[in-house]
Amino acid sequence: DRVQKSKCTLVVGARQVEKSTLIKHEFSEYNRTNFDDKLTRIQAKEEPKLFFLNNPCPLFIDEVQKEGTILEEIKQIVDESDERGQFILSGSQKLELMKGISESLAGRVSIFELSGLSMREIKKIKFNKHFVPTEDYLRERETELKKYDNIWEVIHKGSYPELYDIDRDWQDFYSSYVSTYLERDINELIATDSITFTKFLTAVAARTGELLNYANIASDIG
């Protein structure tokens, strides 16, 4: 288990791929804190020693990119001890997070990227062996094959777990997702308005599979 072999583990991935749920389920023995909470962030920034007294290792810090100064404190802790599995960090802003990690925890952290559900997970197919070009492998895999009755439904829903846990309308889900993405992620990185960014997303989505042409996208956005 790489988590137990590393002093610090970072789990990154898009919002709503259930990073926190996975970590809480698999590592329930870890203490937990979340930097979505402003008071928690203030304490971590202004009184880091007290923060770690209140939140001892092993510790899971969610949305860690929201208070990047804590990474220097984590660096000191992991450098002073040979104990493994001290920290699990997670966050949704990959660019901002990786910048902080490269500056403070380079060579000290194992990085995992959690994607959305695969087709096997969506269809609850238990067969998960790595591909091997042999007849035995193909025969074994064939016993687990399932028919994809409505591939368009899968395309529209995408791979976010929430859309398969409950009967959630996918249009409502993605509308809320874009709004949250704008308010909580994009606006922290660049100054833009919601209409312009929505037009950008639409222009890029309409060109899926095409060669990237910045001029055409800029023309659509106006």
Where in this protein do the model-derived segments appear?
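Short glycine-rich substrate-engagement loop in P-loop NTPases that contacts/grips substrate
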Residues: 30-58
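Hydrophobic anchor at the beta1->P-loop junction of P-loop NTPases
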Residues: 11
